[in-house]
Amino acid sequence: MEDQMKRKYFILNTVTVLTLAAAMNTSSIYANSTETSASVVPTTNTIVQTNDSNPTAKFVSESGQSVIGQVKPDNSAALTTVDTPHHISAPDALKTTRSSPVVESTSTKLTEETYKQKDGQDLANMVRSGQVTSEELVNMAYDIIAKENPSLNAVITTRRQEAIEEARKLKDTNQPFLGVPLLVKGLGHSIKGGETNNGLIYADGKISTFDSSYVKKYKDLGFIILGQTNFPEYGWRNITDSKLYGPTHNPWNLDHNAGGSSGGSAAAIASGMTPIASGSDAGGSIRIPSSWTGLVGLKPTRGLVSNEKPDSYSTAVHFPLTKSSRDAETLLTYLKKSDQTLVSVNDLKSLPIAYTLKSPMGTEVSQDAKNAIMDNVTFLRKQGFKVTEIDLPIDGRALMRDYSTLAIGMGGAFSTIEKDLKKHGFTKEDVDPITWAVHVIYQNSDKAELKKSIMEAQKHMDDYRKAMENLHKQFPIFLSPTTASLAPLNTDPYVTEEDKRAIYNMENLSQEERIALFNRQWEPMLRRTPFTQIANMTGLPAISIPTYLSESGLPIGTMLMAGANYDMVLIKFATFFEKYHGFNVKWQRIIDKEVKPSTGLIQPTPPLFKAHSSLVNLEENSQVTQVSISKKWMKSSVKNKPSVMAYQKALPKTGDTESSLSPALVVTLLLACFSFVTKRIRKVDCNVK
């Protein structure tokens, strides 16, 4: 009988312990899974953007009028209204107009964090399946623009009312990017009612009356155009800054520039405004900002994409920047001309790969850039690829002299610049030094000699192409840094003060001295980006991929080049890296202003905190949440740990109500359990007696 009592006591005690453990665990789950609704940023009529010396906000309303607002120290905007656009006559002048009516955000199915983490196809699939509407995506995007743009200065015009109306009317005709918000570059990608001034301060207020062919194509793919992004004057620079719009700040660190010339688009994607934004590339203008903001930047083969001729000597191509390789692949599939054929390769590992750590200009390459390449070389070798170090068969300085000659040939576009400056109350110092230099050299050139020089430069372009084609016969894929250093500070000069003064007074120089000065003024920029121009001068494809994060928390890209029409092969390599190595994309957090990254010349630690794809490819019924990083942590550990976005899986939710037990129910179960155990013990005691 005593043994029977012991067994019953043991059983009852076990049941009690298990019940208590289950109840405590349930209570803990309930406490940890309680969520608050994501706060929705109030929508505004204005998109505010800043300029270091003259903080202003500028955009175009539905009527086509320009809007600028002074940014107060607390980042709120003081806006006034005028009836018509007018030109800025002083650095601190304000210009505003009536803006579109406020449209309140109605998004309840998508949090800001989840939106920022999705790529274009994710969002299109959500629209197509009815999980969210295009209008909700558009409102979400505008809310984020209103929040992020005051510190970034990425967006220069918006069209909110029109975008919402287009989203409401959108029909599903199997478009690949159904209802996805898109921002387009303010240079060359005109939208009806948007600005079309090439970044020239004296052309401010000039409004486009039509959509460009590229914008029409993007609309055909299902995109909803939100507005235009910032760019440097005429796209000359590898940074984004102009006297008209000011600098675009880097989302990774606001003290640094986003790069150029498609810097506004890059900053918009990196900060989570839109998953895709359009760009153009005549010397690296897609790949450079992609390198400095952690994005995928494809420069297609010359003539491969619609509206471009394959047999021309144009250096410019047009293609969107993305944060995933699959978005780039889909875009290429739909933007490629029907008469063009892409090369296909079944086994990537069958392709020998070459790489270099040396600048074709003979300039310094930072340790960060070298480490990025060697990190990728090591990865490729471990994956079974054959990788060989070589020297580039091209003289980068000779190539840039030819590039300068082609730029001077554009001088005819500035024939009225002096008259236009005077008419609007500006001087030559109010345009970019390159613009003024091209104008003066062109006006003082012997046109027959200039034509001869241009033809000679084009012959050299053929030679450069043949040299690279010969290289690709042996090594189909060529690896190099996209940029030789990390993103520059916004205060870093893009031309020396001495050369700037000389350019604005170059009328007093001989033509030979002018050309020498023009070639020399590129130097500060080319030290940062000596690699990208080769693809433009040869017409061959290249892609920048974001596989490396420096010790200081700034990304730097790796560029892959290949032969003509190997564009899809390059994207397949990007996909391989994204899947097995990891990308630093998927929405990056904005680093605290007080963190000062290096300028790219320090020895970094291995990138242990990359946002590998395995961290973000979560189950459909899991929610991605951001792990906050405090300022204190940033200060103490930035030297050793890159400050990238971290992700964690939340518990699956089965609906709008919590599936966990409430604390009251847990207590009730505990009391019932104790009552049951007590009664059983008494009964056992009676039986024993």
What residue spans do the PLM features occupy?
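Short helix-loop capping/hinge segments that flank enzyme active sites or metal/cofactor-binding pockets
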Residues: 107-112, 177-203, 411-469, 482-485, ...
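A cross-kingdom C-terminal cell-surface attachment/processing module
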Residues: 642, 647-653, 658-683
